[in-house]
Amino acid sequence: MDLSADHVEEVQNVLNAMQKILECPICLELIKEPVSTKCDHIFCKFCMLKLLNQKKGPSQCPLCKNDITKRSLQESTRFSQLVEELLKIIHAFELDTGLQFANSYNFSRKEDNSPEHLKEEVSIIQSMGYRNRAKRLWQSEPENPTLQETSLTVELSNLGIVRSLRTKQQTQSQNKSVYIELGSDSSEDTVNKASYFSVGDHELLEITPQGAKAKTNLNPAEKAACEFSEKDITNTEHHQLSIKDLITTQKHATETHPEKYQGISVSDFHVEPCGTDTHASSLQHENSSLLLTENRLNVEKAEFCNKSKQPVLVKSQQSRWAESKGTCKDRQIPSTEKKIVLNTDPLYRRKELRKQKPACPDSPGDSQDVPWVTLNNSIQKVNDWFSRSDEILTSDDSCDGGSESNNEVAGAVEIPNKVDGYSGSSEKINLMASDPHGTLIHERVHSKPVESNIEDKIFGKTYRRKSSLPNFSHIAEDLILGAFTVEPQITQEQPLTNKLKCKRRGTSGLQPEDFIKKVDLTIVPKTPEKMTEGTDQTEQKCHGMNITSDGHENKTKRDYVQKEQNANPAESLEKESVFRTEAEPISISISNMELELNIHRSKAPKNRLKRKSSTRKIPELELVVSRNPSLPNHTELPIDSSSSNEEMKKKHSSQMPVRQSQKLQLIGDKELTAGAKNNKTYEQINKRLASDAFPELKLTNTPGYFTNCSSKPEEFVHPSLQREENLGTIQVSNSTKDPKDLILREGKALQIERSVESTNISLVPDTDYSTQDSISLLEAKTPEKAKTAPNPCVSLCTATKNLKELIHRDFKDTKNNTEGFQDLLGHDINYVIQETSREMEDSELDTQYLQNTFKASKRQTFALFSNPGNPQKECATVFAHSGSLRDQSPRDPLKCRQKEDSQGKSESKSQHVQAICTTVHFPVADQQDRTPGDDAKCSAKEVTRVCQSSQLRGHKTELVFANKQGVSEKPNLIPSLSPIKSSVKTICKKSPSEKFEEPVTSPEKTLGSESIIQSAVSTISQNNIQESTFKEVSSNSVNEVGSSTNEVGSSVNEVGSSGENIQAEPGRNREPKLRALLGLGLTQPEVYKQSLPVSNCHHPEIKRQGENEDMPQAVKADFSPCLISDNLEQPTGSRHASQVCSETPDNLLNDDEIKENSHFAESDIKERSAVFSESVQKGEFRGSPGPFTHTHLAQGHQRGAGKLESEETVSSEDEELPCFQQLLFGKVTSTLSPSTGCNTVATEGLSKETEGNLESLKSGLNDCSGQVTSAKVSQEHHLNEEARCSGSLFSSQCSAMEDLTTNTNTQDPFLMFERPSKQVYQSESEEVLSDKELVSDDEERETGLEEDSCQEEQSVDSDLGEAVSDHVSETSLSEDGVGLSSQSDILTTQQRDTMQDNLLKLQQEMAELEAVLERHGSQPSHSSASLTADSRGPEHLLNLEQDTSERAILTSEKSRDYSRSQNPESLSADKFPVSLDSSTNKNKEPGMERSSASKFQLSYNRWYMHSSRSLQDRNCPSQKEPINVADMEEQQLAKREAQDLMGSFLPRQDQEGTPYLKSGISLFSHEPESDPSEDRAAEPAHVHSMPPSASALKLSQFRVEESTKNPAAAHIANTTRCNLREESMSKEKPEVISSTERSKKRLSMVASGLTPKELMLVQKFARKHHVTLTNLITEETTHVIMKTDPEFVCERTLKYFLGIAGGKWVVSYFWVTQSIKEGKMLDEHDFEVRGDVVNGRNHQGPKRARESRDKKIFKGLEICCYGPFTNMPTDQLEWMVQLCGASVVKEPSSFTPDQGTHPVVVVQPDAWTEDAGFHVIGQMCEAPVVTREWVLDSVALYQCQELDTYLVP
């Protein structure tokens, strides 16, 4: 049409206006599925559902703020017709004018997220930025009708991409390059965009993938130079890829890179959104040009590949180009060349992308964040769709859809390889090569996103065809590939070309078979096929083929074959392949990017897809995968899709496998890092990947092929034969679970691992598909480690893949179990990833996802199974984190190994209960797993080592074996480990001397065994539901913790989180089995304990490592005292994750209880433990009171567990404990002393690690550390628990012998410090146990002593008497209902008052007791000497580490207090304020000082609170579920305290009280005031001389003192501060802080200006939080509740004035309503009245008055209130004046001017009936006469106003 520019502009303006009218006010895009609200506003259905789902309760219309509900939404079909017609008009306008519709992005965003928009818009987007980019892309999209055609397919594939788009303009770019990179989601798209936009420079940029991401665009030449060097690394192959990349780049320049080359705008667009990915892509492109020029051979290869790939590539490209009219011509012209180049390029790009991704992991993560959030909805939609269509897609893809899909995949793979060659070509190719299915999945997933954008119809269309299955496979494979690529990068540098050629040929040969087999058998054939396929084709197939190696490898190969056959006539195929290629490349590149990047953004999109599971996984992958920045995002989506496919069939199984694969990959990454630990930290590896990004990428790709090629041969050649068998079996089951994903993972992992094996060792093949596989993985890692840094990378990839495969295999073996396991693994991965990436975001998402997954996977079988697997995964996760820090690498390998072993064993475990015990101990788990089926294979490798010994020994040997494998790793990694700060560092340290023993025990066992133990305990201790919830919470909190303490605490946190996950899931299934196991064999207890000791020892060793590495050896050597180890490890587990922490004690408790046949306590403890972990995590993460209550309940249970544990220890390990202690602390002469040292060391080691974590958390989240603190609490709690458990063990020993008990108590001070948090829990559980203890006084005393040792630290928290009463009442309460979580509700106000009175009596008794104890304590000093010696024995360690440990413990206590405060907050206002105060103080105080001071303060507060009913209430609820439990207990305690039972109960009660740290601190406060050593000495002596209870109390006090003092010795300043704090706390007892005061003395409130309804709410609030509500304000009143407006402005009332004058909290009624809403007493600071209607709306008078009580505004004034006053009695006015510091005079004649005071007469003139009255007064007394307003204004503002204004005339 010949339209004048003006006319066109007019039409465009009209269309723009129409579009604006038809766009959704929320997303500002054209309304997709219009829904109308009651208020007649139109929104997108998706936007409204998102809005409605965000809030609980009614949501508001964004436009008119009217309430809207889901029911009120009505679909508006007519409006949707309008939108459709508008889009048609716009499209026609674009076609007619050839102009992009400026605002077409609005509809394109949703509908036209097609590549054409991306392509056309790419250059614009490049220059304009992501948002503009997206718009321009969309604008350009409509211009190309063909593009829109592809757009539908693209949109289908873009559905996954759409998330990216929403997240960032990633989707837009993806859409632009959708044709080429449909497979890549947001992150890959971003990469592609980046690389494409820099396509002009991309040749040069490509050269600098490592650190030149940012520089890429700036220095093309430089980058080219760098790229050349990189290319030199992978010369031949890299050049091949380079040529391909160049040609592809040119093609993409036309197609996808409008920015770089207008034709390539799409790819460019893809690359751009990723920022870093952009650079990486650009680097790739540059590299490809350089490579092109450099390597003609590569071009030849590429041509050869083109012959196989060209048809698909050309077809897909041609179809894309045909579809995208504008780009079509450019593309078609270079079609042949480009095809060839693309074929070469994909390989090149794949490698390049790999390099590039490592190069740009940082920015992709950054960019991921936004896309992640924006993509959330899209991903969710896609996930749902996947869930619905997964099974269909899976079967479709595997069967009929297989050939077509595979062809498409091949096309998609090849084309995307070419396109992605720029942005994610490396990644995509790698992903494709490793995951052909993944490519298809990606394609489909992407298609889904596009469809989502376009509409549900499009959604359905594309999805059916290829997104779901390929995406899932692709995701899994991407993960595998990500790790895998790293590995092949190294291994295949030289063989890459040859292998690529071989693979190319093999692919064509094997394509059909693979295609057909793709589900189960494809892996084996795929590997050879890939090998046989051309080098370039193989490289291409590294995308498609490796992807096919899963399920789609065959498809891809067939596709390639078909493409080869139909090079010219393949246009129809081309279209298919183009479509697939578009989707696949995107998915591949995205997957690769996700894999490699593991960045938040990539996490985010996939997280959405995977519901956060991928998010966490990706962070794990991030460590290894940081090279592929874009990939992780897409990988997440595809993985999610992949898992969704399988998951659709197996609900969580699929997602779990995906997660597992991610986790596995992370593990693999870590293993890789371990393998590459040759002084190459993960960072170094990343750098090398960045610098050698292309060569390594090539290597990675080649190994992908190579692995595929050698996978089968190596399988046969190596012990991998066994693994091959496993592989086959697992393949089948895996395919069943996630046909493509599993196959992809397995095949890929196998192939890669085999290639690695062939290159490195045959161990890798073993790790592919079985327990052996997992072991092999570890083994492979070892050789790889021995090899060069590149080999470690390969090893990492292999390990990752192996882990994935293992997981998949495990899934298959126990499909139900597998699902749970996968879920757990996914959780672990997700949570680790989250830690690595945006932990808050991810953790939140992960929590939801975990909840969903765990809800879905409640089968005990796979729970059990997943438990072992999860520990592995946990280890893997931890190690993945370590992976980034090479220093953690040693642990990683061990953990990975064990993880894999555990996974393999996990399968067995599902079969055998014995496996549960195995789960308890990783080595055992490995052994047991092998025992069932993999035993033969395992025995070949590890079983021989592990199986040789009994289960106990098996644990040890297994650990040793794993260690042996990892030993080679460890030595190399020891230096690297040091960078890992606390957790890894410690491992490293012990690694030198105890590397063989300890690394296995401590790293592997600590992480793996611990997780397993934790999970086993979790099963026992936690209910399934609780566990799943807890898992979510735990992973969240852990994730948060991990994020803040990424380096130091990340591994620990990750371990804890994954352990928690494991525990949670296994807990469900495992509870029965675990119980059976625990009951089954306390042989297993030994194993169990052994595993615990290993873990525990590991931690103590870690602690000692810095101090002595001999200790860890001793610990390991002293496996016989497994109990101590066990106890230590259990705390370690707890430390790792609060869930683990609580679970570990529960486990012990369960064991002991089983021994004691105390199922009540056991189950209760279990539940509570689960609740605790759950709540701790939740509370930590969310700061929710309920979770905290659960936490405390769990804590209480843990206490019980600890106690039971001690009892068990008494029964089974009294002698062993000393041995263990001696072994640990050989230097210490007394066994108790050594045990103390051991405990302390362990605690300290944990503390150190935890401290790092806590400190990092503190620094990052000091006051918002509700979550972090909780995490700290959980960590610290774990530490404390470890200490407590060890103490418990020791105390058990003490139970056996009082001497030991005394010594234990003596020891406990160390432990006590760490235990405080733990002991709180312990004392609670011990309260539960106390019922048992009460059974016999002797036993009670012993247990009390044990508990003393464990809980005397707690006694620090509570006075002895209080502790006793607490214990007694708590015990009775536990008997009545340990789970009396609602007891506070049950108790009436009268009862509470009675309890409070009892508390007061108790306080007095406690004070007396304290005095007696102090006297006794000062007398005996020999015990203190021994105690001091003991303390000092470990103190040398402690001195170095106790400071950290104290800090960590204090921090933990602080955080625990904080959590407690939160929980108590909800439970009781009294409790909350103190807790809040202490937590606030803790947070405020830096380092140990803060934590210790806060801890002491808290301890004191708690003690005081304990004494004062409210204190106990607060603490009990926090410690125990119900405050009322504490109240009732206190009542009972008060009664019992009167009795002498107090003495016998004192230890236990003290322990129980200790959790509060009340009596302990109170006593402790006094004792610290006195000479610490003297007090300490006195107390120990007293322990002997006094009754057990009294001595226990004294001991606990002493211990608190001692622990404080030992740290004081180590860190005098800190201890001094703590002591000073404690002293000041004890001195300040009455007025600790307003909040403390509130807790200490019951809160008292008055309300002013409220309606009767509101008053009822206040009454309800007061009842809930044990607050006294009165009608009149009194001296005791603490809070004045004012009716205010939303700005906290109130009317002035008498209570308002009196509240301000009295310095009370004058808070808004909103404080009550919000506190009720959130279920806890909120901080008043946020609700304090700011002003009033008279004196100003923000004068801050109440705050000023409250904060300056010492500065009285009327000080020095004599005021006479004369005459009548209205609205208030004169005496009230006089009281007000008195409160403000004035002296009141009744008559003006009574003024005393000589006193230096200033007289003032206050009158109210309008109240006088006679005029003359008040005028004479001033003359009579010569004092100024002012109106009452002067007083009121001065009080309201709390500033003495000038009298002149108020003088009476």
From Swiss-Prot:
Q: What EC designation does it have?
A: 2.3.2.27
Phosphoserine occurs at which residues? 114, 395, 398, 423, 434, 691, 711, 720, 982, 1002, 1138, 1184, 1211-1212, 1274, 1323, 1330, 1336, 1382, 1418, 1452, 1518
Q: Could you tell me where the Acidic residues compositional bias lies?
A: 1336-1360
Does the keyword GTP-binding feature in the UniProt annotation? no
Q: Which reaction does it catalyse?
A: S-ubiquitinyl-[E2 ubiquitin-conjugating enzyme]-L-cysteine + [acceptor protein]-L-lysine = [E2 ubiquitin-conjugating enzyme]-L-cysteine + N(6)-ubiquitinyl-[acceptor protein]-L-lysine
Q: Give the GO biological process terms.
A: chordate embryonic development; double-strand break repair via homologous recombination; fatty acid biosynthetic process; mitotic G2 DNA damage checkpoint signaling; negative regulation of fatty acid biosynthetic process; positive regulation of DNA-templated transcription; positive regulation of transcription by RNA polymerase II; protein autoubiquitination
- Composition bias, Polar residues: 1370-1389, 1418-1429
Cross-link Glycyl lysine isopeptide (Lys-Gly) (interchain with G-Cter in SUMO2) placement: K301, K339, K457, K517, K981, K1073
In this chain, the stretch annotated as Disordered covers 530-558, 620-662, 882-912, 1036-1070, 1172-1211, 1321-1389, 1412-1433, 1452-1493, 1562-1590, 1621-1640
Q: Which UniProt keywords apply?
A: Acetylation, Activator, Cell cycle, Chromosome, Cytoplasm, DNA damage, DNA recombination, DNA repair, DNA-binding, Fatty acid biosynthesis, Fatty acid metabolism, Isopeptide bond, Lipid biosynthesis, Lipid metabolism, Metal-binding, Nucleus, Phosphoprotein, Repeat, Transcription, Transcription regulation, Transferase, Tumor suppressor, Ubl conjugation, Ubl conjugation pathway, Zinc, Zinc-finger
For the keyword Membrane, the answer is: no
Pathway-wise, it operates in:
Protein modification; protein ubiquitination
Question: What is known about its processing and modification?
Answer: Phosphorylated in response to IR, UV, and various stimuli that cause checkpoint activation, probably by ATM or ATR. Phosphorylation at Ser-982 by CHEK2 regulates mitotic spindle assembly. Phosphorylation by AURKA regulates centrosomal microtubule nucleation. Autoubiquitinated, undergoes 'Lys-6'-linked polyubiquitination. 'Lys-6'-linked polyubiquitination does not promote degradation.
Q: Where is this region: Interaction with PALB2?
A: 1392-1419
Query: Which PROSITE patterns does the record associate with it?
Result: BRCT (PS50172), ZF_RING_1 (PS00518), ZF_RING_2 (PS50089)
List modified residues, type N-acetylmethionine: M1
Give me the stretches of Low complexity compositional bias.
1036-1061
- Boundaries of every BRCT domain copy: 1642-1729, 1749-1848
Q: Which GO terms describe its molecular function?
A: DNA binding; RNA polymerase binding; transcription coactivator activity; ubiquitin-protein transferase activity; zinc ion binding
| Zinc fingers, RING-type class | 24-65
Q: Which residues carry this modification: Phosphothreonine?
A: T1389
Q: Which Pfam families match?
A: BRCT, BRCT_assoc, zf-C3HC4
Q: What is known of its domains?
A: The RING-type zinc finger domain interacts with BAP1.
Q: What is this protein's function?
A: E3 ubiquitin-protein ligase that specifically mediates the formation of 'Lys-6'-linked polyubiquitin chains and plays a central role in DNA repair by facilitating cellular responses to DNA damage. It is unclear whether it also mediates the formation of other types of polyubiquitin chains. The BRCA1-BARD1 heterodimer coordinates a diverse range of cellular pathways such as DNA damage repair, ubiquitination and transcriptional regulation to maintain genomic stability. Regulates centrosomal microtubule nucleation.
**Subunit record text:** Heterodimer with BARD1. Part of the BRCA1-associated genome surveillance complex (BASC), which contains BRCA1, MSH2, MSH6, MLH1, ATM, BLM, PMS2 and the MRE11-RAD50-NBN protein (MRN) complex. This association could be a dynamic process changing throughout the cell cycle and within subnuclear domains. Component of the BRCA1-A complex, at least composed of BRCA1, BARD1, UIMC1/RAP80, ABRAXAS1, BRCC3/BRCC36, BABAM2 and BABAM1/NBA1. Interacts (via the BRCT domains) with ABRAXAS1 (phosphorylated form); this is important for recruitment to sites of DNA damage.
What is the protein's name according to its record? Breast cancer type 1 susceptibility protein homolog
Question: What organism is the protein native to?
Answer: Bos taurus
